[in-house]
A protein has these predicted regions:
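Active-site neighborhood of phospho(di)ester-bond hydrolases with catalytic His/Asp-centered motifs
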Residues: 48-55, 113-115, 260-261, 295-296, ...
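Active-site microenvironment of metallo-dependent hydrolases
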Residues: 1-21, 25-26, 60, 73-111, ...
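Flexible loop/turn segments at secondary-structure boundaries
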Residues: 59, 120-122, 145-149, 184-188, ...
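A solvent-exposed, charged loop/short amphipathic helix patch at secondary-structure junctions
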Residues: 70-90, 192-203, 313-339, 394-412
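Histidine/acidic residue-rich metal-binding segments in metalloenzymes
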Residues: 157-181, 185-370
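Histidine-centered catalytic micro-motifs
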Residues: 50-61, 228-236
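Divalent-metal coordination cores built from histidine and acidic residues
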Residues: 54-201, 535
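Active-site metal-binding motif and surrounding structural segment of the metallo-beta-lactamase
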Residues: 34-49
Length: 541
């Protein structure tokens, strides 16, 4: 049992905004009161629900591929040494599994979502997640280029496609469905892309990106998954792609959806020489679409590693930069591309990208619908989130940083005109309460009775960067695991998954297809439940 007393509590899900009150914990949950137990004096401190990262890339074959491609990053990274319970690890843009858990927890985050998992490599992903300590986890399954599903959409068999998607979710032991460049990764196997949402993709006569998007959104809603379709739009990173992004949002009208790393989809112009921010245009449209949530995918200057299933984009990035390039096909399901990248403040495109992420966070007026991410490790490392929080809470600090950018870049953005400053309550929403709600994780992101006892306690510091960089305490499931940045305990986190209803007869349809087109047998394909660390099945309702 534990009582936290004297701290200013920010619990926006329960309309608590800086109120000094006690938080009581027993058996890993928030309770109304406790008798006895430890008392934690949080006077002069700020109490938040534990952070929730709705979109990150921290485990699986793609991360291992990236680690192998960038040994120079591992050499430069600060090592995490073995100490007591703590295992050794390496940080940097693609931290090792143990380091990932320590770095998230050391910053005050307690739940993370691995946003891109193919079924074929899901066993690898789950085993790495099992090695990622402290934080709770969930996964999104890559689906918008899975040829088992696309073939059924081509044949207008939407009901059977739904059963296949449901079976694949159950087989992969995941929480949600992810659509990456719908149709574009399939087209990449032919050396092409899917830039026009209305044109059939390569290898099909009727299946378009628009059809894939609308069908998957329908399937996710009909399966009643707690998290809506999680979508990475077509034409990521391209000048003028704001048109595609808004077209995608129009296709999704009437359906739930989460728009991933929106910064990479908010550009105007028609080539790299005149690329400009269209964050204001996109935010204005997004504000009217109450069916949508989004995460920012903000960038920060410095080294990154771009990792995505969006193979055609990665090839273009390789051509633009001349950096190392890795490309993989994941059989009939998806692909993978890796390119190391450095964002530079004196680069006009990078300067605009930096501004766009902040502009979206400031111009989208409802913090319950836009969340803090960097699409780790694509835009910046997740452990740099406090830098972004500092930029959001201080207009003066933003203006100081803007002075370091090229004058031509300033003409292509609106950030200098934005005076909005986030409050602590709004920060609590975009890093915890909002993403938890969008994920449908009802015990996360708040400090109400019955919530998981995931609590972060910060020093109340006017310097937001220093405040959020190192919490005073992190409490995970009722146990103090981090104190002043030091890992005290290393509990194993849970993994959330869903098991939507599925017609068992769908296996009769799938088994012969596997024998014909897969290198893995049908019986070896599903992930066994005993590979999952502390699985917790969430209801589909």
């Amino acid at each position: 049992m534990l009582r936290i007393t004297g701290g200013k509590v920010y619990d926006p899900a329960n309309n608590i905004n800086g109120v000094v009150k006690d938080i009581c914990i027993a058996d890993g949950r928030i309770v109304a009161d406790v008798e006895g137990g430890r008392i934690l004096n949080a006077t002069g401190m700020v109490v938040f629900p534990g952070g929730v990262d709705i979109h990150t890339h921290v485990a699986g074959a793609a991360l291992n591929f990236a680690r192998g491609m960038t040994p120079e990053n591992q050499r430069r990274a600060v090592p995490i040494l073995h100490k007591g319970e703590r295992r050794a690890g390496i940080g940097g843009p693609t931290p090792t599994t143990y380091a990932t858990g320590y770095l998230y927890a050391g910053m005050g985050w307690t739940t993370v979502v691995e946003a891109a998992v193919p079924v074929l490599t899901a066993k690898h992903t789950h085993e790495e997640l099992r090695d990622t300590p402290i934080v709770d986890k969930a996964c999104c399954l890559l689906m918008a280029n899975n040829e088992l599903v696309l073939d059924l959409l081509e044949a207008e068999e939407i009901e059977r496609a739904k059963q296949v998607v449901s079976w694949l979710i159950r087989a992969a032991k995941v929480y949600g469905v992810k659509a990456v460049n719908p149709g574009g990764v399939t087209a990449w196997k032919w050396g092409k892309d899917a830039k026009n949402l209305a044109e059939p993709i390569e290898g099909y006569s009727k299946t378009t990106p628009a059809k894939i998007i609308s069908s998957l959104a329908q399937i996710v809603d009909e399966l009643r998954l707690p998290h809506p379709l999680h979508i990475h739009c077509n034409n990521l990173g391209a000048p003028g792609n704001v048109v595609t992004t808004i077209e995608t949002m129009k296709i999704l009208e009437g359906r739930r959806a989460h728009m991933a790393h929106l910064q990479f989809h908010a550009y105007g112009g028609d080539d790299w020489h005149n690329l400009r921010s269209e964050a204001a245009t996109l935010a204005d449209y997004f504000n009217s679409q109450l069916n949508l949530t989004a995460d920012a995918g903000a960038i920060l200057f410095g080294d990154a590693v771009t990792i995505t299933a969006d193979g055609p984009w990665q090839h273009l990035l390789y051509q633009l930069t001349g950096r190392k390039w890795g490309n993989l096909d994941v059989e009939n399901e998806t692909g993978c591309g890796i390119v190391p990248y450095t964002y530079r403040p004196n680069n006009l495109v990078n300067a605009v990208q930096w501004a766009v992420g902040l502009e979206l966070l400031l111009l989208i007026n409802d913090p319950w619908r836009i969340f803090l991410t960097t699409d780790h490790p694509n835009g910046a490392c997740f452990w740099r989130y406090p830098e972004i929080i500092n930029l959001l809470t201080s207009a003066e600090f933003r203006r100081e940083r803007l002075k370091r950018l090229p004058a031509k870049a300033l003409e292509r953005m609106t950030l200098m005109d934005l005076d909005r400053e986030y409050t602590l309550s709004e920060i609590a929403i975009i890093i915890s309460a909002g993403p938890a709600r969008a994920l449908g994780l009802t015990r996360k992101g708040h400090l109400g009775i019955g919530a998981d006892a995931d609590v972060t306690i910060y020093h109340d510091n006017p310097d937001a960067y220093q405040m959020f960089k190192v919490p005073r305490y992190l409490i995970k499931a009722g146990e103090i695991v981090v104190e002043e940045g030091d890992i005290r305990h290393m509990p194993e986190g849970r993994e959330f998954l869903v098991q939507p209803p599925c017609d068992e007869k769908i296996e009769e349809y799938l088994r012969p297809i596997f024998q014909q087109v897969y290198t893995m047998s049908f019986d070896n394909y599903p992930v066994e439940m005993d590979r999952i660390a502390k699985p917790e099945i969430q209801n589909c309702k």
